[in-house]
């Protein structure tokens, strides 16, 4: 796109389509400027019938507003949409006194968010004030909801394992809701793998990182019964994934050369 539009950064590029009345070539589908990614995608798509990673992703926790306003009526004036916004947004930590620096009771849970200079911090809140978003009571992997620029192969900004009773604000999304830490460690290794991030890069063309961008990343079995040995290193797991999806040497070399390593 920079060749046609000088000094302009168009994240998704520019697609030029031609029409030939004499040919029927079918729909474009998901467009990628890399031929290797298109061929990898064709090999992976049949496996998506078994699930994709976006199906086990969970957005931020939400407030139970009735409970919150019963104890903190002043919060209604500080919550957007005339006090109807239920999502725990990035600014909730600084605006609402229901969040505390220290645990105030055995029923309090920790919430991961961003403080000054976008530094990651945890604050406490009584559990009765928040809904269970589907993974609050279980292990999960927490990743930023916005990351990088959308370039193929970028690293994810410090994904981490969230223990049970840890939630998160709108700045993050959670992957998985599993009962054991070993399963969460397997998920963490998977999202660090070059293969998974290559598949993510097909749909992620901006910094935004919502669940739908992970729709082409095939779901895996993260238990000990998996066909992938999750006890191996991330690079060794990549080799297993390349074999599972039948990638050619050319396709493997493309991923290895275009996707940055994460350990």
Task: Give the residues covered by each predicted segment.
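Short, amphipathic C-terminal "tail helix"
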Residues: 250-263
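C-terminal substrate-recognition regions of SAM-dependent nucleic acid methyltransferases
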Residues: 3-169, 176-249
């Amino acid at each position: 796109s920079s060749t046609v539009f000088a000094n302009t950064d168009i994240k998704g590029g520019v697609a030029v389509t031609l029409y030939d009345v004499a040919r029927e070539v079918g729909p474009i589908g998901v467009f990628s400027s890399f031929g290797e990614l298109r061929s990898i995608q064709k090999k992976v798509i049949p496996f998506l019938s078994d699930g994709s990673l976006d199906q086990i992703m969970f957005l931020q926790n939400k407030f139970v507003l009735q409970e919150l306003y019963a104890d903190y009526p002043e919060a209604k004036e500080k919550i957007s949409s005339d006090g109807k916004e239920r999502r725990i947004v990035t600014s909730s930590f600084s605006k609402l006194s229901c969040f505390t620096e220290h645990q105030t009771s055995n029923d309090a849970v920790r919430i991961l968010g961003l403080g000054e200079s976008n530094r990651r911090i945890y604050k406490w809140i009584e559990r009765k004030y928040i809904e269970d978003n589907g993974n609050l009571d279980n292990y999960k992997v927490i990743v930023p909801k916005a990351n990088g620029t959308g370039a193929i192969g970028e690293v994810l900004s410090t994904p981490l394992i969230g223990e049970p009773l840890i939630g998160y604000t709108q700045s993050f999304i959670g992957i998985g809701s599993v009962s054991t830490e070993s399963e969460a460690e397997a998920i963490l290794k998977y999202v660090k793998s070059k293969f998974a991030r290559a598949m993510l890069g097909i749909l992620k063309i901006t910094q935004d990182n919502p669940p739908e961008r992970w729709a082409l990343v095939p779901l895996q079995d993260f238990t000990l019964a998996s066909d992938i040995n999750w006890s191996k290193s991330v690079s060794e797991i990549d080799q297993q994934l390349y074999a599972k999806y039948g990638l050619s040497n050319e396709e493997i070399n493309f991923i290895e050369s275009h996707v940055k390593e994460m350990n």
